[in-house]
Swiss-Prot record:
Residues 1-21 form the signal peptide. Glycans are attached at residues 44, 179, 363, 371. The keyword Repeat applies. The gene is A1BG. This is Alpha-1B-glycoprotein. It comes from Homo sapiens. GO terms for biological process: immune response-regulating signaling pathway. Interacts with CRISP3. Plasma. The keyword Repeat applies.
């Protein structure tokens, strides 16, 4: 195949030749407080750090600052820290691993003597209710032996459970939508703790849609006989999945590595198998209640029996390009194909009424550098497809646009809390990095398929105060690195 050579000397742009299942073990330790007397719950307090595996090493953190680590003579499953002096503060702990330390425990906050710290409220497995689903509210406190209470906004009564002697959390069934919070008390007549943050429960007539994905060869222009794998992911585990094309269920081989997803295997696609595929799921306890359909995934097949289309670029004003694909057939389905070091895949689809499809690329940057071509397929039997057009190479020089960094809080962050900074850029599927002013090594790195990421500083202390910037980078299919964002200042307050 010949290569069309075109040079676009605008804005530095040049056209030229060209499953195995994973097993995970929970290691995060648990941290709770115990008091000599629940009548004076914040006097003579002992913090217990419990690991998942026996270890001789434990460490406590207070207000974001590490305390002296403890090394025991023999491994233990837990260790108790006796608090002395001013016990008010925010605590976390970690336990030893053969290769270092575990992640930090969840936050435990001890307030002043006149109030009990708020518990945490979460919903399991999801924050919605629907027929056939058993949703529960989990209220996690600070002290053992307390009584937990759940409240729905607008209700006058609490849903109360007995004392949680052996744990610091309680579970409540949730049957109604609304805004929920929970509290606890240390004795039957005692004052309530501060309420937890509010969690909203929605009532849905049907479960929300899953996500259907295809990767690798499945996202290319397919040929008869190719194998395709489609992955359907639900927002919860233990459901029944279904693959559909249009309104027809497809009974195809399937496999799974996790209870929240399924792999559908199309082992030998044929002409006519192109088009839109969706998936859905239903709960085991509601066999008639299917979720909404996923967003469709489109497959395109070509036997390359039809003539190749004509493919040409048309520069537009600004950082934009229009790619024209012309076929000798009306009413065809067109596909713009991108090829780079990451592989060859369909970039976009169009179904124009005539014989010409116009694909527009806006805000072009170095991330758009690739080889492009187009194909078309006949939507009528026998569903023939074209050979690919001549390839065009787009080469863009220069760094990509700078990202923006913003804080998700206002004012100062309390020592011992988490600080979340959001870095936003124009290019998806990149790695975001957070850097402290004057340092070259990233303090936080997040890989994301999107064009933005939350960069979280866990359990900040005075040592974390300062200015931060972010950037994004990529190694595949192209190696590039953005400039640093404008700075955002992190202030840390003790109280």
């Amino acid at each position: 195949m010949s290569m069309l050579v075109v040079f676009l000397l605008l804005w530095g742009v040049t056209w030229g030749p060209v499953t195995e299942a994973a097993i995970f073990y929970e290691t995060q330790p648990s941290l709770w407080a115990e008091s000599e007397s629940l009548l004076k719950p914040l006097a003579n307090v002992t913090l217990t750090c419990q690991a998942h595996l026996e270890t001789p090493d434990f460490q406590l953190f207070k207000n974001g600052v590490a305390q002296e680590p403890v090394h025991l003579d023999s491994p233990a499953i837990k260790h108790q820290f006796l608090l002395t002096g001013d016990t008010q503060g925010r605590y976390r702990c970690r336990s030893g691993l053969s290769t270092g330390w575990t992640q930090l425990s969840k936050l435990l906050e001890l307030t002043g003597p006149k109030s009990l710290p708020a518990p945490w409220l979460s919903m399991a497995p999801v924050s919605w209710i629907t027929p056939g689903l058993k949703t529960t509210a989990v209220c996690r406190g600070v002290l053992r032996g307390v009584t937990f209470l759940l409240r729905r906004e607008g209700d006058h009564e609490f849903l109360e459970v007995p004392e949680a002697q052996e744990d610091v959390e309680a579970t409540f069934p949730v049957h109604q939508p609304g805004n929920y919070s929970c509290s606890y008390r240390t004795d039957g007549e005692g004052a309530l703790s501060e309420p937890s943050a509010t969690v909203t429960i929605e009532e849905l007539a049907a479960p929300p849609p899953p996500v259907l994905m295809h990767h690798g060869e499945s996202s290319q222009v397919l040929h008869p006989g190719n194998k395709v794998t489609l992955t359907c992911v639900a927002p919860l585990s233990g459901v029944d999945f279904q693959l559909r094309r249009g309104e027809k269920e497809l009974l195809v081989p399937r496999s799974s590595t996790s209870p929240d997803r399924i792999f559908f295997h199309l082992n030998a696609v044929a002409l006519g198998d192109g088009g839109h595929y969706t998936c859905r799921y239903r709960l085991h306890d509601n066999q008639n209640g299917w979720s909404g359909d996923s967003a469709p995934v489109e497959l395109i097949l070509s036997d390359e029996t039809l003539p190749a289309p004509e493919f040409s670029p048309e520069p537009e004003s600004g950082r934009a390009l229009r790619l024209r694909c012309l076929a000798p057939l009306e009413g065809a389905r067109f596909a713009l194909v991108r090829e780079d070091r990451g592989g060859r895949r369909v970039h976009r689809f169009q179904s124009p009424a005539g014989t010409e499809a116009l694909f527009e690329l806006h805000n072009i940057s170095v991330a758009d550098s690739a080889n492009y071509s187009c194909v078309y397929v006949d939507l009528k039997p026998p569903f023939g497809g074209s050979a690919p057009s001549e390839r065009l190479e787009l080469h863009v020089d220069g760094p990509p646009p700078r990202p923006q960094l913003r804080a998700t809080w206002s004012g100062a962050v309390l020592a011992g809390r988490d600080a979340v900074l959001r870095c936003e850029g124009p290019i998806p599927d990149v790695t975001f990095e957070l850097l402290r002013e004057g340092e070259t090594k990233a303090v936080k790195t997040v890989r994301t398929p999107g064009a933005a990421a939350n960069l979280e500083l866990i359990f900040v202390g005075p040592q974390h105060a300062g200015n931060y910037r972010c950037r994004y980078r990529s190694w595949v299919p192209h190696t590039f690195e953005s400039e640093l964002s404008d700075p955002v200042e992190l202030l840390v307050a003790e109280s």
